[in-house]
Regions:
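Short, Lys/Arg-rich, polar N-terminal cytosolic tail immediately upstream
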Residues: 1-15
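Alpha-helical transmembrane segments of multi-pass inner-membrane proteins
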Residues: 13, 17-35, 53-65, 85-96, ...
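Short, hydrophobic transmembrane alpha-helix segments
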Residues: 35-49, 68-73
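Interfacial transmembrane-helix boundary/kink motif in multi-pass membrane proteins
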Residues: 74-83
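Alpha-helix initiation/capping motif
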Residues: 36, 45, 77-78, 194-196
Length: 267
């Protein structure tokens, strides 16, 4: 039986395929921290690296296949795009090509640049994916936090003989760093949205806050405090309220800024 599509139906069909592929490949990328392969040398690390390469390749192929036919929305060039390209250009210009000390990191950085523009394309074509990616990212943070709690209480094994808390990573450093990255996202979601995403954001943030201090990573603590402070300032305070407070307490503003700068420098 032959199935015929009208122009609008064909367009919706292609849009659905594009959205489904973006959802699958995006979820694969976000789930990279959970990947490990015991058949590889240092499989906890190399497994994640190979999985990221595979996910990026599939995402790029899926983008080419779905973007080739039909019309597409125009993606405006924004300031972050220019800053990212400028940073990539400076990195390439200052890299020691003769010595070539970090080819793997150079490849990884190039893939991140490509990933940025792939996400720009997919989120422009299907804005609903923003909520899906947010949910999956926060879910990974919640799973990592629960995983860490199980390791602390002896219900799960750690991946390092010297550390009790590693999550799905090899040591506490990247584990705490990942939690510090996901935490401000959870806080932003809890402050920005209502109902389901609001409560889920607070649950994820609370779970991360419980386990993050046990990682004993001061850099992760500082990153989490600064990022969460910035998120709260943008969502609840803003520049206008800040200027009003500075004008009201102008005699104490400069000493306060100086003390904060000294404390940050000492740490």
């Amino acid at each position: 039986m032959e199935i015929k599509y009208t122009g609008m139906e064909l367009k919706l069909h292609r849009h659905g395929i594009r959205t489904a592929l973006a959802s699958v490949f995006g979820a694969m990328l976000i789930a990279t921290p959970f990947v490990g392969d015991s058949a590889l040398a240092n499989g906890i690390v190399t497994g994640k690296v190979f999985w990221f390469h595979l996910s990026m390749a599939l995402m790029a192929i899926g983008t080419v296949v779905t973007a080739w036919p039909g019309g597409r929305k125009s993606i405006p060039f924004a300031l972050p795009d220019g800053l990212l390209l400028l940073f990539a250009g400076i990195t390439l210009a200052t890299y020691d090509w003769q010595l070539d000390p970090e080819p793997e990191k150079l490849l990884f950085g190039g893939q991140l640049v490509v990933l940025w523009f792939l996400l720009r394309y997919f989120l422009t074509e299907a804005p609903c994916l923003k909520f899906f990616f947010l949910f999956v990212l926060m879910l990974t943070g919640l799973v990592e936090a629960v995983w860490g709690m199980q390791q602390l209480h002896g219900y799960a094994y750690s991946n390092h003989s010297l550390f009790r808390l590693t999550g799905s990573f090899f040591n506490p450093g990247p584990y705490c760093g990942y939690l510090a990255v996901v935490l401000p996202v959870c806080l932003w979601t809890a402050l920005r949205f209502q109902k389901g995403m609001h409560y889920f954001g607070w649950v994820c943030a609370g779970a991360i806050l419980i386990v993050l201090p046990a990682g004993m990573s001061r850099s992760a603590w500082m990153a989490a405090v600064v990022a969460c402070g910035w998120v709260y300032w943008t969502e609840r305070i803003g520049w206008e309220k800040t200027k009003a407070v500075c004008r009201r307490y102008k005699n104490a503003t400069i000493p306060f800024i100086a003390i904060v700068a000294i404390l940050v420098g000492c740490t």
